[in-house]
């Protein structure tokens, strides 16, 4: 294992950091050249004047959420890190012989290396300590289910894509969940706690108001509804993570003996966003799946017979078949359908219905009056939905006259949508189909900015990775155009995402 580094984000604490966290590290005989203190530019001189000479002082950004993201970008993926707040006095563990008291940790180095060993044995990336400094609540055990990892002390392997933040006051809850979803667990050492002056010193999170906390808690609950509940006490409000959350199921279809690399990454992305995955298959050889997928089989990855929903006839066009298949599945079972070339980058929105969309031509002979139109990449509908039943009926009626081609069945679905008030459930195209089909090749090229065609501006690679919750990879076009998706540049959009999930 590469030796770990110690990272300390600090803001307006130059006058206490040396007497708190730095002094603790000195007491543990930690070499200062492995310590990195992240500060804002305006305070660099103040920290430089008080910190030990060998200590690394890095100019970062303001705001703990943005600073965490900056730290993640500063180090390589997989770099072992020990993150410490700047106000830590000491670390304590439950006394094995007398469990009515705690004793100071004897060797920090030993604690860190033993924790990384435990992470490796559980195939996890994030570990933390018990969040309350009270022997009464400590337990002489470790857990790997969903439990809060407080940001004061974290031992982890850096994952750049998991260090991006959308929350400020709840950033450590967000971190806990992102690593939990990606790995299937987080390691918490329930016999060790932290002695620090949390929420009482100047600096740190400056604008911690009740109103802002309420707003973040509500937004967090909406985003991660299955994984948490809101708790209130006196004049405070907070989040409580659920140890055994109820997982949402995504359903897909695959006809064929093997899956391709795009589908492999897509299925992995669904699992690493914490979903159960049910794939209806015909002829798939599960033994040829990548080991990263096989470990989920019969746990969160299940397979069912696709022909129970609808029979696939030899020689039949696969696209119109799969379109009708999904309508029939949703009408019979209800739930969430997702295309097997749709990679998830974040959680799906919690709303009654989901209908994804794609860009339309805004110039040329095929110019559309609409800037986007509904598609069927991700769909969420209730069982026995009237609109779906009408769509199925129309498709089956027209198929008696002529065999459907390419997108015929999707067009009938779009026609039925217009008759209903479903527009409010449309997902803006950049959130799932940010790179249009006419630019699909650029997904697999070393580009950060994509070509504007047909007067449609395409968001940048960084924007999509930060803001979109899915990415349609246009697998059908890659096959027809013989795109080498495995050999594509690692810095391409697809290459970047593939590295994240593998």
Language model: regions and residue ranges:
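Conserved catalytic core of nucleotide-sugar-dependent glycosyltransferases
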Residues: 91-174, 347-415
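Short, well-formed alpha-helical segments that are part of the catalytic scaffolds
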Residues: 8-29, 43-49, 258-269
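Glycosyltransferase-associated regions of secretory-pathway enzymes
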Residues: 184, 239-322, 340-502
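Short beta-strand/loop segment that forms part of the nucleotide-sugar
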Residues: 7-8, 22-47, 57-61, 276-284
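Active-site-proximal specificity loops/subdomain of glycosyltransferases
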Residues: 38-84, 89-104, 285-324
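Active-site donor/metal-binding and catalytic loop motifs
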Residues: 185-242, 429-440, 471
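Short aromatic/hydrophobic "clamp" motif used to bind/position activated sugar donors
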Residues: 81, 335-337
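Donor nucleotide-sugar recognition loop
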Residues: 161-195, 208, 343
